[in-house]
């Protein structure tokens, strides 16, 4: 029995299928960076330990084996700065699996920018410096970041959606802080109401134009031809065919002014609103449209009534008022009163004129002055022929 055990120990049992394979020299095949330092252990053919393989898969121990000289060849792992920049570094970047959302199940690379986050319940990352082959320190990120403490909206708003929120529009330092004022049309309605109240007051002040006397229609002469009419302007007869055309043209001219009047009225209303807006800027002593909008929307009624009175007086001063209708006799007497003191002053200060003054003219031939102009009255009773005969005699 002892001899059999010794034979078994010297020659282990080999399965009939497993045959010893000749040793092959390792070929210089390119390896990835993750296969660096991984050395295959010698495996006895025919004997497989599944428990050992399962444990190795569960807990992979980091191998701290020194690299062989063949690892520094070109094509294998190189610690030159070119390869560290242009190739992925599995030792320096780790990936975490995001759970809880289907659209974020892809892995997110962890970088050192996550260190700036200061959310409640977030543990700081452990950054351990390690030296490169050249002696330069390399920052290695360890995966100790917990996503359970982060709520979903804060994670999305701070980590993923890193765009800064702009509260003030770009380009206008004194922008409209209340954007509802510019979008709403309520302030425009208030301004239109205020302008209408001002215009109603000004219409009452404006003098009514004198009603033009309607000229009596000219009596047309009886038609000499059937359907023909005589025109006093041209002195010709207008045939009946052209009359229909002229009537249509007149009707068209009557229709068009109504549409034009509507456009003119709309433009006048817009001009009135602009005028009221400009006067409000002067009354409120501001050049900000936002301030005027706020005043139109939220000003008390007493303040608006006070501003309305100021607007009415300002608009009334802008309206050109006609001269008061003075009777002609009063105007004539007033001009004569102004003329008499001027004549007395000239007579007092010019004594030499008394000697050379011509004899006074009769009242009938005495010129009358309107300002500095002389007005000579021609008597209609005397004919010019009679005057010439008297002068000849």
UniProtKB/Swiss-Prot annotation:
Induction: Up-regulated in aged mice (4 months of age or older). This is Protein TBATA. It comes from the Eukaryota. Expressed in the subcapsular region of the thymus and lymph node (at protein level). Highly expressed in thymic cortical stromal cells and testis. Lower levels found in brain cortex, hippocampus, kidney, cerebellum, skeletal muscle, epididymis and ovary. No expression detected in other lymphoid organs including bone marrow and spleen. Isoform 1 and isoform 2 are expressed predominantly in testis. Isoform 3, isoform 4 and isoform 5 are expressed predominantly in thymus although isoform 3 is also expressed in testis. GO terms for biological process: spermatid differentiation. GO terms for cellular component: cytosol; nucleus. Belongs to the TBATA family. It holds the Pfam family SPATIAL. Residues 173-185 have a biased composition (Polar residues). It comes from Mus musculus (Mouse). Residues 20-34, 205-227, 380-393 have a biased composition (Basic and acidic residues). Isoform 1 and isoform 2 may play a role in spermatid differentiation. Isoform 1 and isoform 2 regulate thymus function by modulating stromal cell proliferation via interference with the NEDD8 pathway. Interacts with KIF17. Interacts with UBA3. Keywords: Cytoplasm, Developmental protein, Differentiation, Nucleus, Spermatogenesis. Residues 1-39, 168-188, 202-264, 340-393 are annotated as: Disordered.
């Amino acid at each position: 029995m002892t001899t059999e055990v010794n034979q078994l120990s010297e020659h282990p049992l080999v399965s009939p299928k497993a045959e010893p394979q000749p040793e092959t020299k390792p070929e210089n095949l390119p390896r990835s960076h993750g296969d660096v330092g991984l050395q295959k252990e010698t495996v006895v053919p025919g004997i497989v330990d599944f428990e050992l393989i399962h444990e190795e898969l569960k807990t992979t121990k980091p191998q701290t084996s020194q690299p062989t000289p063949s690892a520094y060849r070109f094509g294998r792992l190189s610690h030159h700065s070119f390869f560290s920049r242009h190739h992925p570094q599995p030792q320096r970047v780790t990936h975490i699996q995001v759970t809880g959302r289907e659209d974020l199940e892809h892995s997110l690379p962890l970088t050192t920018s996550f260190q700036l986050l200061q959310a409640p319940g977030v543990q700081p990352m452990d950054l351990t410096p390690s030296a490169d082959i050249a002696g330069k320190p390399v920052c290695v990120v360890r995966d100790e970041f917990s996503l359970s403490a982060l709520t979903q909206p804060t994670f999305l708003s701070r980590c993923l959606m890193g765009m800064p929120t702009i509260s003030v529009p770009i380009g206008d330092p004194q922008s409209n802080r209340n954007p509802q004022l510019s979008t709403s049309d309520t302030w425009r309605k208030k301004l239109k109401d205020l302008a209408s109240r001002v215009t109603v007051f000004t219409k009452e002040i404006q003098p009514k134009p004198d009603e033009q006397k309607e000229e009596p229609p000219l009596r047309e002469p009886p038609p000499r031809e059937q359907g023909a009419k005589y025109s006093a302007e041209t002195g010709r007869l207008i045939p009946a065919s052209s009359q229909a055309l002229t009537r249509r043209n007149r009707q068209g001219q009557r229709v068009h002014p109504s549409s034009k009047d509507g456009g003119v009225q709309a433009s006048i209303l817009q001009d009135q609103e602009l005028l009221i807006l400009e006067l409000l800027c002067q009354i409120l002593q501001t050049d900000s449209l936002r301030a005027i909008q706020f005043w139109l929307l939220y000003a008390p009624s007493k303040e608006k009534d006070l501003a309305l009175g100021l607007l009415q007086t300002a608009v009334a001063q802008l309206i050109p008022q006609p001269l008061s209708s003075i009777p002609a006799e009063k105007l004539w007497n007033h001009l004569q009163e102004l003329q008499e003191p001027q004549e007395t002053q000239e007579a007092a200060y010019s004594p030499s004129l008394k000697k050379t003054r011509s004899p006074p003219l009769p009242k009938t031939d005495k010129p009358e002055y309107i300002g500095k102009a002389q007005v000579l009255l021609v008597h209609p009773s005397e004919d010019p022929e009679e005057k010439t005969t008297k002068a000849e005699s």
